[in-house]
Regions:
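Hydrophobic anchor at the beta1->P-loop junction of P-loop NTPases
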Residues: 6
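The conserved Walker
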Residues: 10
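Conserved lysine of the Walker
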Residues: 14
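Hydrophobic positions on the alpha1 helix immediately C-terminal to the Walker A/P-loop
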Residues: 17
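Conserved substrate/cofactor phosphate-moiety recognition/catalytic segment
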Residues: 22-66
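A basic- and aromatic-enriched beta-loop-alpha substructure that forms the phosphate/nucleotide-
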Residues: 66-104
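A glycine- and Lys/Arg-enriched "phosphate-lid" helix/loop adjacent to the NTP-binding pocket
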Residues: 88-162
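NTP-dependent small-molecule kinase module
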Residues: 138-194
Length: 194
């Protein structure tokens, strides 16, 4: 089984590109998908960056991936990954002043992240420039972030991928969904996975 994560900032097109890649792969392979876990979560948006919610999202992501892998698909496509959850935690931690337990909590989440990330065959980092994100966000009713937030988060993705040597490929999602999906398929072919 090859586990492929689609990661990136909100509004970048992860879910849409994943769906198209899933359609293409399913023509020849058994494919299962792990959906984005946030829409069905018990947390409001402003509560999502706390320790309890991050622990929930990280452990739920691991559990859902394990459950879906029991069906032994050839490809397991994940709408988001532990990379996304870990970076949400790091961003929130940078914005808040910590209490005495912050270091312990951070160490626990980091241990889960470091343990689980090698289970991904590769990560597709879906990217879009600020103007595209602003336009998509308005159309989709997504929360508008402070100026520079998307850029800072995108930079944090790049730094983390490089520092942790995560096998990742950037897909700039400015073109059609078909073209973005084809870029992903080319990378999978280059890796000799298809």
């Amino acid at each position: 089984m090859h586990k492929i994560a689609f990661s990136g900032i909100p509004g970048s097109g992860k879910t849409t590109v994943l769906a198209e890649v899933g359609k293409l792969l399913s023509l020849k392979y058994r494919v299962d998908e792990v959906p984005d876990l946030k829409p069905g979560s018990p947390f409001d948006y402003d509560q999502r960056a706390g320790f309890v919610s991050m622990f929930y999202f990280i452990t739920s992501q691991i559990n859902e991936e394990n459950i879906r892998s029991q069906g032994r698909p050839d490809f397991l496509l994940c709408d988001g990954s532990l990379l996304d959850r870990w970076l949400e935690w790091r961003s929130a931690k940078a914005e808040k002043s910590g209490n005495g337990q912050a270091a312990e909590r951070g160490a626990l989440l980091e241990s889960l992240y470091r343990f689980w990330m090698p289970s991904y065959t590769t990560v597709f980092r879906i990217r879009a420039d600020a103007m595209v994100l602003k336009e998509r966000g308005a159309k989709a009713g997504l929360q508008e972030f402070a100026p520079g937030h998307s850029r800072q988060t995108d930079e944090l993705y790049g730094q983390t991928i490089q520092q942790d040597r995560i096998p990742a490929f950037d897909i700039w999602n400015h073109q059609s969904i078909d073209e973005s999906a084809q870029v992903a398929m080319v990378h999978l072919a280059d890796m000799k996975l298809i």
